[in-house]
Amino acid sequence: MTRYKAIISYDGSGFYGYQVQPNTRTVQAEIEKALTKMHKGKTVRITASGRTDTGVHAKGQVIHFDSELDITAEKFQKALQVMTPFDISFLTVEEVPDDFHARFGTVGKEYRYVVKRTKIFDPFSRNFALHYPYELDISKMKLASKRLIGEHDFTSFCSARTERDSKVRTLYSIDFYEEDDETLVIAFQGNGFLYNMVRILTGTLLDAGQGRISPDDISEALLARDRQKLISKTAPPQGLYLWRVDYE
């Protein structure tokens, strides 16, 4: 039995999230279907670094799986690329030690959120970015983001449905990239993220960019540890990308 690590990307528009769910199309289900077919009907399960919600994309999701097939990692990559749908891509496949774990071995992740700042709605980017036709002061967003850097209890910045007992996470950095006059990318790097955390942080920073909330409001929300204390909405899923997963 050999363990394989794969880095995959996918367009989340056509999936009901990553995780297998009854009677729905998911990323995990499509990949496991292909692997099971390769193994002549024997079920093969995959493990990912984490789940993504409906409409959320991935540029660098990491999975692992075990196989008894006597084929190279390169052939696995080519076969899976052919046998999975066009909205999933296998960027790399490699053999790894048996103790490698895609989920529990992570030491950090990067998510990016894409904002289209056009006055007129662009139908071609509707599934891949948030349309935000309002004025933004990027300098205010940067000031607000500094209050979020470091180790904090992010209870106020995650969904009430978060299953984790501890809401303490460390944000290493929040960077802002103005790719052109119309596109703003916000990059979040941290040791881990809670359910809806990046989308809530994005909504908060957009409000800061409009002057609706101040850096002090963010500090107070962190201390309150109560999602109801935060006025900012959760940004929609289509602008969010799991960009990179780091391991030791």
Swiss-Prot record:
Active site: 53 (nucleophile)
Reactions it catalyzes: uridine(38/39/40) in tRNA = pseudouridine(38/39/40) in tRNA
Entry GO MF terms: RNA binding; tRNA pseudouridine(38-40) synthase activity
Keyword rRNA-binding (UniProt): no
Pfam family, one: PseudoU_synth_1
Subunit structure, as described in the record: Homodimer.
Family: Belongs to the tRNA pseudouridine synthase TruA family.
Function field: Formation of pseudouridine at positions 38, 39 and 40 in the anticodon stem and loop of transfer RNAs.
Keywords of this entry: Isomerase, tRNA processing
NCBIfam families xrefs: hisT_truA (TIGR00071)
EC number: 5.4.99.12
Binding site residues for substrate: 111
Biological process according to GO: tRNA pseudouridine synthesis
Top-level EC class as recorded in UniProt: isomerase
Record-given protein name: tRNA pseudouridine synthase A
Highest rank taxon of the organism: Bacteria
